[in-house]
Amino acid sequence: MSKILIFFIILFSALQSYEIKQTPIKFSQKRVELTKQYIRQHYGLKVEDIKITPQIILIHYTAIEGFKKSLARFESETLPNDRPDINKAGSLNVSTHFMVERDGTIHQLMPLNYMGRHVIGLNFNSIGIENVGGEGFVENLTVEQLLANIFLVNYLKKRFETIEYVVGHHEYRCFEDTELWLEKDDGYRTKKFDPGPSFMRDLHANIKGFKKAPCD
């Protein structure tokens, strides 16, 4: 992305204000209990609730082009049968705190202080932002989504002073040798491409006060 375009993105994002639409996924006591089980199985922690203290903002793409189809992947409380890459790790369905449409519309899907299942090893200390797109593992997120993500990470920093990092899903394994990494199963890893280095480079060029992934 050119320096001129980055300048205009910074200028526009400083003036832009976003409505965060409340679009809750199903999160009954059943999902809470499944989350507790996941925490116990994968992190070795026995918890009374599923509240988190976020230190990382984790950026994703859905690998699906449509918002409704993307949202549908998170609705069920239990994991669908078509996820053989992760279903061996528990029946808790994936979840994320935010989803950003192609036009930059922001949806909050779940409470910000609840743990979602959106990344191996780092769920217990991260807030997930899913961006609609990336089908076929193509880096095709929009400028509108970039602007919305700039707004969101700054908004979240104001909400949670504990947040230090903004990283892409493809960078999650950079944390394996840090105190933030909690996964106990050394065989539970998947290869991720989202949202891609270009989007993260452009995002970091337009935000301040956040650390990059430790191996960056």
Locations of regions flagged by a protein language model:
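Solvent-exposed loop/turn segments at secondary-structure junctions
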Residues: 63-67, 103-106, 112-117, 133-137, ...
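Sec-dependent N-terminal signal peptides
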Residues: 4-13
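Short, conserved "active-site rim" segments that organize catalytic pockets and cofactor/ligand binding
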Residues: 40-106
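Short coil-to-beta-strand
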Residues: 57, 120-129
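Basic/polar, cationic surfaces and motifs that engage anionic cell-wall
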Residues: 18-33, 135-216
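Solvent-exposed, acidic/flexible segments
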Residues: 50-52, 91-92, 119-122, 138-146
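Short, solvent-exposed loop/turn and secondary-structure capping segments
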Residues: 68-74, 109-111, 121, 178
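Macrodomain-like recognition of ADP-ribose-binding/processing modules
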Residues: 18-40, 49, 93-98, 103, ...
